[in-house]
A protein has these predicted regions:
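Long, hydrophobic alpha-helical segments that serve as membrane-spanning/inserting helices
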Residues: 1-2, 6, 27-237
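Hydrophobic membrane-insertion alpha-helices, especially the h-region
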Residues: 11-24
């Protein structure tokens, strides 16, 4: 009887170990599948980051040109260094391009979050950077964009009595948001005595600087993000 009991006990342990091993193997396989899917998403992420970097570089170039225009227009207001044609050109570029916005592609980040795959990322540095770029920077981006929109609604109305520039499409300039040129303009005789004009240029300059600083942060973040994603893929390849 004792011998029979021991036999049953051994069989029980064998079956138990088999079931436990089966569960362990199944869990390991499922985790491996999730890791592989996470890696696929990260590989796609790299492609999207490259596209965003290209878009970002265009925006940074435009913002730098807007900063130059605001400097030129402020200097002209106090020193009258520009012809009316050049004044109209600089004003048109500034007014049509300073409101440019950057929209990073965040669909894959949302997918990582919603699927729980982000928790499978080994590098805590990578997880933190993803949150910084696609949440913290995005919040700042949205806030600055709203500020720019509000600024446009009020400021252009304020300066409309002093300067109006009409534009038309230009095939010569293919940069985003800037493919227009002056068609005609109306600059009032009170332009150089207006208080609204320098206030408009000064605030434009400040907002351009704030947005350019944020774009610099994005650029640094994307550069680091590429490196960290590649390290993650090498670690779990």
């Amino acid at each position: 009887m004792n011998h029979t009991f021991k036999g049953y006990l051994i069989e029980f342990f064998i079956v138990f170990i088999g079931i436990a091993a089966s569960f362990f193997i199944d869990a390991a396989v499922k985790k491996n599948e999730k890791v592989q899917l996470k890696n696929v998403l990260l590989e796609e992420f790299l492609l999207k980051v490259e596209e965003d970097i290209e878009q970002l570089q265009n925006i940074q170039e435009i913002l730098a040109r807007c900063k130059d225009s605001s400097d030129i227009l402020i200097d002209d207001f106090y020193n009258q260094t520009l012809s009316e044609d050049n004044l109209a050109n600089e004003y048109l570029y500034l007014s049509q391009n300073m409101g440019i916005s950057f929209y990073p592609q965040n669909g894959l980040y949302e997918q990582l979050l919603e699927s729980g795959k982000i928790e499978l990322i080994v590098s805590s540095e990578l997880r933190i950077l993803l949150s910084t770029i696609y949440e913290h920077y995005e919040d700042r981006n949205s806030a600055l964009t709203r500020t720019l929109d509000d600024f446009f609604l009020t400021s252009f109305t304020n300066v409309a009595n002093d300067i109006i520039v009409f534009s038309q499409s230009s095939s010569e300039n293919q940069i985003i948001y800037s493919g227009t040129r002056v068609k005609t303009y109306d600059i009032s005789s009170s332009y150089y005595t207006s208080r609204d004009i320098p206030a408009f240029y000064s605030e434009s300059q400040n907002l351009i600087r704030f947005y350019a600083d944020l774009m610099d942060n994005y650029a640094k973040g994307f550069k680091e993000l590429k490196l960290l994603i590649k390290e993650e893929l090498r670690f779990q390849s």
